[in-house]
């Protein structure tokens, strides 16, 4: 695990130096992915700004991790910002227009946070560092388009969720964070990732590997999970594919 961690830290460092960027900015939610990414970023020695952004939620784990980072790394400057008032105004305007989908509001929370991250990063000649893992980013597309999917670099997007947990253990991430059920923190009711997806990350990893290898699945329970995985992947491919462009070649 030491070699993997050092490889990612070196990769982040090299990218920042090649593009003459002076800081690393990321959202911290109290989840395993953002905790690992913010710690890997801090280990580069580059100025690191982890931001806790509350909107109708105040995750103590996010605050504890941000404090832990600042205590353990001299190059870390944590930030805590309450976006509730801003989002409340947006919510009122949306409802006035009849655009009151709770799913859309959940995505808008993610996009508002993305705006804040880029405001801070651009103001400090920095990079927005993504926190998505391979299962989310390239398996089922479990992220918000132009929200948490809007980043400059993605250090753990080639790491399975199980690998992220191993990194968290190696990096001594707070045990409460390692033990907490994964959640995107975008819903008022506090629903977990498993509540939304209908499967655990272990199941998703297994299905992702089966799909990539073309494994023939005959057990009914496993077949249902694989079909669920494929359905979600198909629905979200628009996030993973380039934006469709109307081809005008025949007019040239």
Region spans (language model):
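Short, structured secondary-structure boundary patches
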Residues: 46-48, 68-75, 99-102, 149-155, ...
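Residues on a specific face of well-ordered alpha-helices
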Residues: 63-67, 115, 162-171, 202-205
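Catalytic subdomain that performs nucleotidyl-dependent activation
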Residues: 105, 109, 127-200
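Conserved NTP-handling cores and scaffolds of large molecular machines
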Residues: 45, 73, 172-175, 211
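ATP-dependent adenylation/nucleotidyltransferase module used to activate substrates
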Residues: 1-142
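Peripheral terminal appendages
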Residues: 1-28, 32, 36-40, 49, ...
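Short, basic, helix/turn surface patches
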Residues: 74-81, 104-112, 155-163, 201-214
